[in-house]
Amino acid sequence: MKTRIAILITAAVCAVSCYPDYVGDYSRTACGFANQTDVRSLIVGEGMTFSTGVALGGTINNDEDRMITVGVDYSLVNNNTYKLFTGHTFAYIANLMKDVPSISALPASIYELESDSGLPGTAIIRKGTHLGVIKIKVDSAAFLSDAGRLLPKQVIPLAITNGNGTDVIEGKEWSVIGVRYENMLFGSWYHGGYADVADSGGNTVRTESYATTIPQADNLVWTLTTTGPFELTANAVGGEFNGSAAQMKLTLGPDDSITISSVPGAKYDVQPDGDSKFLRSRLLQDRKIVLNYKYVSGTETVHAHDTLTFRNRIRDGVNEWQDENPKHYE
């Protein structure tokens, strides 16, 4: 959110001024949305909310509270807007839209617009600040009932309906946000562990170790990819190098357990071999996953015991490698 706030403020200032000459207030102070099309990812298990904002430009010192009325404008959900998504400047948005043939409005019954102003649909740009925040709270059960929402096929179309005394920047008065989800364990993980290798008779013939090292070579780092609200795939097994294809599926249970299963097209038929679980730390960087599974390689059976340690994840174009929520450090 910190990164997005900086972008919002910079964009608003540039929209009403030329930055190299910006040494004082301009005659016109105006507000608007920085991005007319955007995609936001809701993280399953971390609270199904996100924030967007109305930014103020044209003044260094905002000397008053400004109430900006924001509403939903369904007329913005059209083919022209869809084309802006598919041809987006940000590659991660354009890539997400490749498999989305059209957009539709997210049903209003699934989400609420909240604000620290206490007034529904009102963003308040407080005195001394340049950003008014709108928080979108999504009903998790209703949203996740459609697993296809992994893609941003549905949008929330926002528009400033009244600046209440503050000018609105032409062309910046609206923002259409595609909404999708990611599982909380998606991303890149340092990998380590050991494997007991048994012969056809079930006798252990050797133990292979592959310790976790930080930093770790990229071809040893595992990638977990969201395939459903509570499902991910992993792109490696045991001590082998990773690849582009999924090698096993992880299904998360309500008790933080993980069920391991095979996936079509994988190198091995991976099966569970003992309990697997994830450690739900409040801090992103402290999360770990413990996996126990087996697979047959030639005439041998590999019994793998792995630990994954969180490295980073890319959410909405932002590299997240440690928790940014101050409350999680309390």
Label every model-predicted segment.
Residues 18-123, 133, 137-330:
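Intrinsically disordered, low-complexity regulatory regions in eukaryotic proteins
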Residues 129-130:
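Beta-strand-enriched, solvent-exposed domains that form extended recognition/catalytic surfaces
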